[in-house]
């Protein structure tokens, strides 16, 4: 049963990181395009970009918390 907990932990971390990774890539790509088209709004775009990255990265942190809960046997 310990082996299945390790597999579940690995899946929680791995799959929990795919979505935020893609999301952050899309956010940064959009920010770079926006700054390239209109360099005067760089400060505002960068601020919104970091806010978006923080919210997106929270999803990966939730996946990591779930993985810890599975790994330590709190969730089964």
Swiss-Prot record:
Protein name, per record: ATP synthase subunit c
Keywords of this entry: ATP synthesis, Cell membrane, CF(0), Hydrogen ion transport, Ion transport, Lipid-binding, Membrane, Transmembrane, Transmembrane helix, Transport
Membrane topology field: Multi-pass membrane protein
HAMAP family: ATP_synth_c_bact
Location(s) in or outside the cell: Cell membrane
The protein's role, per its UniProt record: F(1)F(0) ATP synthase produces ATP from ADP in the presence of a proton or sodium gradient. F-type ATPases consist of two structural domains, F(1) containing the extramembraneous catalytic core and F(0) containing the membrane proton channel, linked together by a central stalk and a peripheral stalk. During catalysis, ATP synthesis in the catalytic domain of F(1) is coupled via a rotary mechanism of the central stalk subunits to proton translocation.
Residues spanning the membrane: 7-27, 50-70
Oligomer status and interactors: F-type ATPases have 2 components, F(1) - the catalytic core - and F(0) - the membrane proton channel. F(1) has five subunits: alpha(3), beta(3), gamma(1), delta(1), epsilon(1). F(0) has four main subunits: a(1), b(1), b'(1) and c(10-14). The alpha and beta chains form an alternating ring which encloses part of the gamma chain. F(1) is attached to F(0) by a central stalk formed by the gamma and epsilon chains, while a peripheral stalk is formed by the delta, b and b' chains.
GO cellular component term, pick one: proton-transporting ATP synthase complex
Stored InterPro entries: ATP_synth_csu_bac/chlpt, ATP_synth_F0_csu, ATP_synth_F0_csu_DDCD_BS, ATP_synth_F0_csu_sf, ATPase_proteolipid_c-like_dom, F/V-ATP_Csub_sf
PROSITE patterns: ATPASE_C
Site keyed Reversibly protonated during proton transport: positions: 57
CDD domains to which the protein is assigned, alphabetical: ATP-synt_Fo_c
Protein family according to the UniProt entry: Belongs to the ATPase C chain family.
Pfam families the record matches: ATP-synt_C
Example of a GO biological process term: proton motive force-driven ATP synthesis
Superkingdom of this protein's organism: Bacteria
């Amino acid at each position: 049963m310990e082996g299945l907990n390790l597999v579940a932990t690995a899946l929680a971390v791995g799959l929990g990181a795919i979505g935020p990774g893609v999301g952050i890539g899309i956010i940064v790509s959009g920010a770079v395009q926006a700054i390239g088209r209109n360099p005067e709004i760089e400060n505002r775009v960068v601020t919104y970009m970091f806010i978006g990255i923080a919210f997106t990265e929270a999803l990966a942190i939730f996946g990591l918390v779930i993985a810890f809960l599975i790994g330590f046997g709190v969730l089964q």
